[in-house]
Amino acid sequence: MEVNPPKQEHLLALKVMRLTKPTLFTNIPVTCEERDLPGDLFNQLMRDDPSTVNGAEVLMLGEMLTLPQNFGNIFLGETFSSYISVHNDSNQVVKDILVKADLQTSSQRLNLSASNAAVAELKPDCCIDDVIHHEVKEIGTHILVCAVSYTTQAGEKMYFRKFFKFQVLKPLDVKTKFYNAESDLSSVTDEVFLEAQIQNMTTSPMFMEKVSLEPSIMYNVTELNSVSQAGESVSTFGSRAYLQPMDTRQYLYCLKPKKEFAEKAGIIKGVTVIGKLDIVWKTNLGERGRLQTSQLQRMAPGYGDVRLSLEAIPDTVNLEEPFHITCKITNCSERTMDLVLEMCNTNSIHWCGISGRQLGKLHPSSSLCLALTLLSSVQGLQSISGLRLTDTFLKRTYEYDDIAQVCVISSAIKVES
């Protein structure tokens, strides 16, 4: 009795090859001076080499292309393409051939086959070809499972499969930082600055085609990665946005809440979704990759029960001449407040108007705009301070100092509007 029967050979052969872009052929030039012993021998060999560029033989980069010599690296965001070929190596006609390609990741199994229909028959020395594509969205171990089933002339059903394991690497390291904008000194606004640090983790340069921020429905975004020169927008990274291996680049964005959300004080509190980064790059011979981050979140700053912000203020004012500012008071609490406004003078800033006036009831998440008048008795950069809001129900006073700064100049100097 035979314990281990011989392994049956299949009539069909399966070949799987990864499809990638070719690379430019490179050679190492070897030269010498004419008075050296080899004379012009090395230079003549380079001129006769068909892979060199005429007139620039010492240039390492040639005019020819090199086909991929190995499987290579696969990075997150790239498109994995593979050529699958099933060839009939026998002298028999094989029937009901079904080729199935699945990609097994750490979290799911995907069917990549273009068609799940079986081929009626396959004659000797004929083949079935298929090309599969898949945008890689996970890092880690991936297994390409290729299964082939067919029926022989004798009616015997045959089946075999092959496994191809490969690793998906991370092409970019993305780090984000949030900065809450400050209006002058201490009056915190709703504007948020996002700094995105992107590092090239591959071994080849990248052309950064697009790095954009897709904001959430609560925010509008402004990109701060360009400057205006002669009426044209010029990128701060130059005309050639290449990112060399292990290099890092910083992108900056400003987000501001939409008007319908900014007017509702309670919505911007706590953890809010900012948006997500969309990064598109190109590598060897234009091979494209794309990466989208998950939704970015940040902790919104706390304003307390009452928030005071500035809507309008002049940059420069004249000495001992009244000027006007517009303040916005927002009730950030969940109860109705009855507020009283008090204005306290400082050594340089003097408020004009009645202190201790009633502002009336302010409902939750509602706002009130106030036009205030003041003057400065000291030249220079002066800080506006001395506003007090008192909640008559809780007898609680909210103090607002260093609200903003103005430049005070002599009245003999004309203030440019």
UniProtKB/Swiss-Prot annotation:
GO terms for cellular component: TRAPPIII protein complex. InterPro entries: TRAPPC13 (IPR010378), TRAPPC13_C (IPR055428), TRAPPC13_M (IPR055429), TRAPPC13_N (IPR055427). Transmembrane segments: none annotated. It comes from the Eukaryota. Belongs to the TRAPPC13 family. PANTHER family: TRAFFICKING PROTEIN PARTICLE COMPLEX SUBUNIT 13. Part of the multisubunit TRAPP (transport protein particle) complex. This is Trafficking protein particle complex subunit 13.
